[in-house]
Regions:
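Conserved short-loop catalytic and cofactor-binding motifs
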Residues: 6, 65, 169
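NAD(P)-dependent Rossmann-like dehydrogenase/reductase catalytic/cofactor-binding core
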Residues: 148-150, 155-196
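Conserved residues at beta->alpha junctions
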Residues: 9, 113, 168, 172
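C-terminal substrate-binding/catalytic lobe of Rossmann-fold NAD(P)-dependent oxidoreductases
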Residues: 30-35, 39-166
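Predominant activation on well-ordered alpha-helical scaffold segments within soluble catalytic domains
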Residues: 16-23, 78-82, 123, 152, ...
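Glycine-/Pro-rich loop/turn segments that contact NAD(P) or position catalytic residues
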Residues: 1-34, 40-49
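A glycine-rich, Thr/Ser-enriched phosphate-binding loop motif common to dinucleotide/cofactor-binding enzymes
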Residues: 3-14, 69-75, 173-180
Length: 196
């Protein structure tokens, strides 16, 4: 609808923050990822249930709609990433799971670039990317309560040509929702002022 802006999925936002500078440098050819999503993404009831159980006993409900092949969360991640990155044909395969963590989503990402991209160069690009912080070992616990997407474990993926592997974590209630909505509003207001 004209005049309505949709806030992307809480896993799409951190993923695209990390993919964008890598794509601008070397072009993306393919992306595969697994998400490890905290129970806060399923709501307050899920958080209360986790608080009352030992994590080992927690029933990891996959609370997304399933079409027989994939969860709608996986399809949404693919569609939104393609749209945001302006790469409508980009091959993306995602597997999404819910984990017994209160706040913070994590993603293991394997990507293939069109041009060679050394892990050291990827680290440099990500270290200077907006809303991204390079950490040796990102985790949902480290990401909880902060605005940046934490990314680390950046290394060559020897199973494919021009392959990189990395791990990221973000606060799904901040960067994945509220903060991102504020940043979108600020961007729209700055564009409006510039046009006036």
């Amino acid at each position: 609808h004209d005049g309505i802006v949709a806030n992307p999925n809480c896993c799409t936002i951190p993923l695209t923050c990390v993919l964008k500078p890598l794509h601008e440098e070397a072009g993306l050819a393919r992306v595969r990822l697994a998400t490890y999503q905290s129970v806060s993404g399923a709501g307050a009831r899920a958080m209360e249930r986790l608080r009352g159980e030992a994590p080992a006993d927690h029933d990891l409900r996959m609370d997304w709609d399933f079409d027989g092949d994939e969860f709608d969360e996986e399809a949404k991640l693919r569609a939104e990433t393609r749209k945001i990155m302006e790469l409508p044909e980009l091959p993306i395969q995602a597997t999404c799971v819910r984990v017994p963590v209160l706040v913070g989503h994590a993603e293991a990402v394997w990507l293939e670039t069109e041009e060679p991209l050394a892990p050291e160069r990827a680290r440099e690009l990500l270290a200077s990317a907006p809303s991204v912080r390079v950490e040796d070992f990102p985790s949902p616990g480290k990401a909880a309560g902060i605005d940046e997407v934490l990314v680390g474990r950046i290394r060559r993926d020897p199973t494919i040509e021009n392959g990189l592997a990395l791990f990221l974590a973000s606060d799904n209630l901040r960067k994945g929702a509220a903060l991102n909505a504020i940043q979108i509003t600020e961007l729209l207001l700055s564009r409006e002022r510039a046009a006036a």
